Amino acid sequence: MKIINEIYDRTIEDEELKYLRNNTCLLDIETTGFSREINHIYMIGLARLENDKIKVTLLFADNRSEEKDILIEFINYSKDVNRFISFNGLSFDFPFIKSRMNHNGIEYNFMEYEHLDIYKECKKLKDILCLGNLKQKTFESFLGIEREDSFDGGELIHQYKLYEKCNDEECYHNLITHNLEDVQGMVELLIILRYLHITDNIDNSTISEITNTNGEIVAKITTDYNIPKRFVIKSGFYYILFEKNIIKTILKPNSCTLKYYFDNYKNYVHLLNEDIIIPKQLLNDNNKNNAVPCKKSNCCIDVEGLYLPVFDKMLFEDEKLFKENLSSKETYVDISSKLNDSLYLKKYIIHIIKYRLN
């Protein structure tokens, strides 16, 4: 068994420190396959904060018979750990370790620890950030993190078998480099968690630079929350760019005619000769013979306007909401009178952001 210690020589940001304090340990394992029953753990990568530096410790089994040795060393290492941080550790690493400990007759209780699984926390970012997959290297690539290592965990199985067979130095280098960069990469990845908190204080942001050109509304929202890399959310009705602490928005309302449906349709009648809807209490001797009770499907009026979709009806419950027809699930607001209303536009833009990001 080998124990490799490295100091990850970089400045630790405050955002990272809040995750790494209080005896927190980052963990990543390498295995000879995906079956907990028949495959082995050949390396456990660990890292923790020591004297404001990240100290990485790799527990490496020179052969499969040393699996028990690195598991026991891992227990010794983690005696004063309060929390683990991993990437997909709750689904892979920790169940694998538990199974292999059982196989080796070692008792250990992972339920005593807190766990932060970056993969689990960030799964929803795949679509938001337009990532091709949820691999650690894909998140690192989005953040601009570069690696020396070019292997994935599956390819390293063959490298480990070669190392077991003939102590190949190149294979050893590849194995150590991969796990080292996996563990170091998790430190770098902590910043990705910022994307989960963009909306936390967004209601206190400010809106400015509102312009209305060629039917599009352009606005800038300034927040107190910085993100490391820009990204975009968009649809046919909006384009929203997030860059550092600025949110640049283009709203694209649809100029068309939609229907407004009255509540309590039984309280309305349809005047056939005038083709209008009126409340029953407005009936009189002059028009009652031309009136028929409204149905739910026709108790509406057509309204021309500039429409944008609504994703949270409760937020706009004091406004008229419009639809294409009664069975339409989509509802819209008419912003014709709100084009220069900065507070309203801010409210509308933030409601889109919360819908897409939360």
For each feature predicted by the language model, list its residue ranges:
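DEDD superfamily 3′-5′ metal-dependent exonuclease/proofreading module
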Residues: 1-27, 32-39, 49-358
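Short beta-strand scaffold segments in enzyme catalytic cores
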Residues: 44-46
